[in-house]
Amino acid sequence: MQSTPIILVAIVLLGAALVRAFDEKEALAKLMESAESCMPEVGATDADLQEMVKKQPASTYAGKCLRACVMKNIGILDANGKLDTEAGHEKAKQYTGNDPAKLKIALEIGDTCAAITVPDDHCEAAEAYGTCFRGEAKKHGLL
């Protein structure tokens, strides 16, 4: 599969995953490993996983919780359900290979999304961050 995982690692590596400057197969493998370990914990289905991989909004609460679990496992969602910008910046550096232009975009996306107001519910927060990541990635021509 040639899709960049995101968002997540939309989802989600604070936009760095959307920059495509890293080993997509390795990133997707890490995302899948994390997601598969989270699925039983949150009651997510294969359909929830496929939505995440395809960078689509979650259609179920379990799908939102799957994203929150993955983001926590990766280290970018903290115990309070907020983006950990310091960890996100480190992930951005790692996944952009420190390419200055790509790193700048990834950090901009991460900082923009970290500044949004999200619900206290961690699952809903993860979905809100994912929506932000997708929107910002589109603005930068990455999706």
From Swiss-Prot:
UniProt tissue specificity: Expressed in antenna, mostly on the medial and posterior surface of the third antennal segment.
Highest taxon, organism lineage: Eukaryota
A Pfam family it matches: PBP_GOBP
Coiled-coil region list: none
Disulfide bond sites: 38-69, 65-123, 113-132
One GO location term (cellular component): extracellular region
Subcellular location: Secreted
Keyword Mitochondrion appears in the UniProt entry: no
SMART domains from the UniProt entry: PhBP (SM00708)
The keyword ATP-binding appears for this protein: no
Keywords annotated in UniProt: Disulfide bond, Secreted, Signal
CDD domains from the UniProt entry: PBP_GOBP
Protein's UniProt name: General odorant-binding protein 28a
The species this protein was found in: Drosophila melanogaster (Fruit fly)
